[in-house]
Amino acid sequence: FDIQITNNNLTPIRDDDFYLQPSTITGCRMDFRNGICARNGETPATEVRYNTIFGNTLISEKTRYNAMALLNYELSDNVEAYFEGSYYRSENARKNDASAILSAVPVGISRNAYWNPFGPTTLAGGVPNPNRLPGTTIPTTGADLIMERYRFVDAGNRDVLVDKDSYRFVTGMRGNLGAWDFDTGFVYSESKVTDLETNRVSLTLLQQSINRTTPDAYNPFNGGCATDDPGQGDCTPNPASVIDSFRINVSRKGGTSLALADFKISRDDLFTLPGGNVGIAGGVEWRRETFFDDRDPRLDGTITWTDSVIPGVTNGSDVAGTSPSPDTDGVREVYSAFAEVFVPLVDPDMNIPLVDRLDLQLAGRVEHFKDIDATTAVPRAAASWTLIPGVSFRGAWSQGFRAPNLVQVNDDGTTRSNTRDDFVICQAQVAKGLLANLGACPGRGVISFRSGARSLRPEDSESINLGAVLEPGFIPGLTLTADYWRVKQLALVGTFGDDNAIALDLLRRLAGSTNPNVIRAAPTPDEIALFAGTGLAPAGQIIQVLDPYLNLDSRVSKGWDFGLFYKVPDFGAGQFRLRFNAARLKSFVQSASADGEELLAGIAAGRLPADVTIGGLGELLEIEGRPKWRMSGSINWESGPVEIGLFGQYTGKVWDTSVVRDVLLVSDDPNANFYRVSDQFLTNLSFSYTINNDTGLDGTRLRFAINNLFDKDPPLADETYGFFSELYTARGRVFHVELRKKF
């Protein structure tokens, strides 16, 4: 809470910012009765920080329905018609944490609000105010407050219900026209999603409830659990009738569709070379993609919020904890053509030394994107060389592209509230001795404005793959593979990042200019006084940061893939199959854009303080979700109707850059001060029995499986649910029973 007074000495808190905590915890400045007190500051101590995943559902409850139909019909000896139809429906339900106010969107509490502890000394009609706390010299008329980052725990967790319906139809003809094979068809698919979230909070209705002058007003000062665990639940909730006055449901509807028509033709014997028949394939394709995203009226700007206490404070969203998002839709038409040729240059019958077989593949594809008026053409070349039987080498070179998606092109502007460090303000505080360093800069809510553009061009890429395959004749059934790959991506579509934009604003202000993408209010007299003598021009608070989608920088990644596949010859003890795969990420380097290079140069030259770090650039190997090693392997044994399988999966260690040592180490390793996230190894075990006889049970299989056999937890990380969900699984030991019958 923030008391709207100019003199901090009017209360025992001696600060305009305070938060509530149990009186049994140290740091109390002012008694708030009923076992709670006020402590100065705006960042709660560790003991009272709320467990934001309390009561949440980690894994959604899901119900799925599927239906499919296939039909083939021979029109003639050479032509067949086909049809495929499918329908899919899913119903998901989960609980999310209770709603909270965004850090950049505080709510004003009137001095006349019934539960305001710093309200007037008397209520309407001259009745003494029972809720005004003693021991202050706040004027008898009371003081307004601002409520920041408040979580409505007494409203309960949010229920999220997501229903998805998808269907797909395919129809076409295939066959041959003379020596040519052809396939032509039409595909249409559509998916619609309804997302309903209950137990949300309307800012407008909330403020009306808080600022009532009667006891049925919402009371945000009653504390959570003063005698129990203050980090979860609410032991002193407001009455349900009060909460119901501002409780709302929020909905979102979205959908995508794809219409595609194509014609493909191929022939595997266009003409003959000494190495064999030359094959060719080609085709043309048209596709139309659409999407729509229909947000709730309280999110899309139809119903907005204007603070009735704090002048000039508005928000495009009336939903607590959610930034405004406009309704968005888009359409894209794409025309494409491709051609491919297979050229066998050498075969074994030619008896060429050290060349048992040599094959070449050449391909190309061209696409035109109508909505962004961009045309791309990409080639591909691949070769396979068998040195001697059982020893082969392979390689491929290709160019690729990825068009910006429809959201990146059609987004008219989405705002997001993020907690960011205002390095400019904090640098002035460091210069004045108010902060020890920029590392102590307290985060504040910052509005980031993200928008799309039709001027975005497709991303380009270049890939190289080189590999070898070994199938030694003296070990029948064994195959070993090793492949090196390298991918270079150019003009990646993304955002610069509001935190990087603020850091760039500091760098330029140190040189006498500014970053125009960081829009600030005019400095107040207090801010002008703060900047005096610091060498920086006075700066006001950040209004918003412009962070549009751009074609930014390049990325180069490379690594190795290894494989082992072994079907053990039958030696009388059943059939064994072994499989092992390993992926070694060698490097993942993200280059900087022009603005990024300016930041990196400023850090290297010492113009930016060492406390300013630039994320997402440079060598990102083992950073966040990019482990060096991923491995998986399995052993299967089969004898008659019985099969037993053992599967293992390994995911390597990574660094969590959101956790930094309190005392920094001096090290040549740039990641030494980050938190090291452990690796994980999971084991699955399965048993199956298949009935093979002449009865009605023939073809029936009963399978029993245990996933995560040893009930391993994911390694700890500073993430939403305490682990990297894109790398590790939180599912404990899971038992599966499956009964399948083939007809």
Regions found by a protein language model. Name each.
Residues 61-65, 163-167, 257-259, 331-337, ...:
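Residues that define the transmembrane beta-barrel architecture of outer-membrane proteins
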Residues 416, 574, 578, 582-695:
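C-terminal beta-barrel architecture of Gram-negative outer-membrane proteins
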Residues 81-83, 182-184, 278-282, 337, ...:
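Transmembrane beta-strands of outer-membrane beta-barrel proteins
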Residues 4, 9-12, 16-62, 68, ...:
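Surface-exposed, low-complexity loop segments enriched in small/polar and acidic residues
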Residues 204, 479, 488-491, 586-587, ...:
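C-terminal beta-signal and adjacent terminal beta-strands/loops
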Residues 76-79, 176-182, 270-278, 346-358, ...:
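Short loop/turn motifs that connect adjacent beta-strands in outer-membrane beta-barrel proteins
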Residues 87-91, 177-179, 186-194, 269, ...:
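Transmembrane beta-strands of outer-membrane beta-barrel pores
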Residues 69-73, 171-175, 261-267, 337-343, ...:
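Residues on the lipid-exposed face of transmembrane beta-strands in outer-membrane beta-barrel proteins
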